[in-house]
Amino acid sequence: MRKTKIICTIGPACRNEETLTDMIRAGMNVARLNFSHGTHTEHLETIDMLKRVREKLNVPLAIMLDTKGPEYRIRSFENGSVFLNDGDDFTFTTDQIVGNEHKVSVSYPGLADELSVGDTILLNNALLNFEVVSIDGHDINCRVVSGGELSNNKSMSFPGKTLKQKYVSEQDRSDILFGIENDVDFIACSFVSCKQDLLDIKAVMGDSVNRIDLIAKIENRTGIDNIDDICTECDGIMIARGDMGVEIPFVELPIIQKALITKCRLLGKRVITATEMLESMIHNPRPTRAETSDVANAVYDGTSAIMLSGETAAGKYPVEAVDTMARIAMQTEKNINYTKRFGTTEFRIKNPVDAISHATCGMAIDLNAKVIAVCSLSGMTVRMVSRFRSPVDIMGMTVDKKTWRKLSMSWGVTPVLCETYESTDVLFYAAKNKAIATFGLESGDRIIVTGGMTNGVSGNTNLIKVETVG
């Protein structure tokens, strides 16, 4: 079975039950809703549709809400756009005006107070580059370093700067509460720069923080520099290479990607590699060779999940994109020696759950087991076993439907919903039967079972047992 999970962004190209069904069958594990676009009414229709489809197929499809996050944008031009030449003078202002070829308003009222002479302003995915030459009251006077066409409402970025805009906007607050009300499984938090950003999100979530997992989107230098602190407050990260590639030199992206994947894997945090993975499939039925290698390299690095954005949201071939990504991942995984990696990687073993999870994976390799069955209420033990990237298939057993869905994003895990067990004997019997039914085991095949003896108590992992079919 494929170990690397696939996240798909839902948009006009796939927002119908037939296409969503085909995408799930092709390999979609998590459906992502981008709240930078659309209304709550539109998103509710999509969520209800996803719930109907997953119920019909009886699959643990998880739903991810991706927040808009703190954004900095220019406002509108009188004629919709202007063309700026290299060397032109141009002004950004916090005054509310209609833009022209000399000046345009910005959305953040405190911008002039926070920028300095010599700072860089990038627009339109860094295609347009401005240098601040002076600041006069509300006006930020710039020189155009790299010109081009600039149109309404383009986003702005400021490499090397951390601005003081409030992290959780009213829009994000409303979206988060909407997601809680409609039972989303993950919230992806945009432009996370420090752990306080996540604490602010958790304050909005209240008690729901224990039911919805937080994914920190790493999109700027500050987020990269603060990754250790950020990982203490999140359940995983997304390497959002689009905005990250604007903020930092593009030649550093592959190095940062590999470092972040390795860090999260060792910490037991899920890690998503995202942006432009199969970008050409927005228009073409097949990927480029470079895109194929990009997906494969993320899989080689051990990413938990790979993500499709415009390919499924707005592309001509959403189902084909999912199928292509799944086939690349599976073929790559066949050529990775996970047993050797397990033996040579130095893991941090900090507590009994870590130790038992590590021992479980080692025992499964030594005994040539076919399946590791992990029984977990919250999914924590399953995620800890997953982080060791075992060559043996992992079956994540849980009585909780929410956990069942969230395990869909854990590397190497096949989520299985089970009934409550009353004793270890019942647990072992259920694990064996579920493994036989799920993986087609035969007489003589071994299963390693791990979990906790106390029914219904999270974080009580304290046993390992070897079961043999037959």
Explain the meaning of each model-derived region:
Residues M1-G470:
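Non-catalytic helical/linker scaffolds that mediate oligomerization, partner binding
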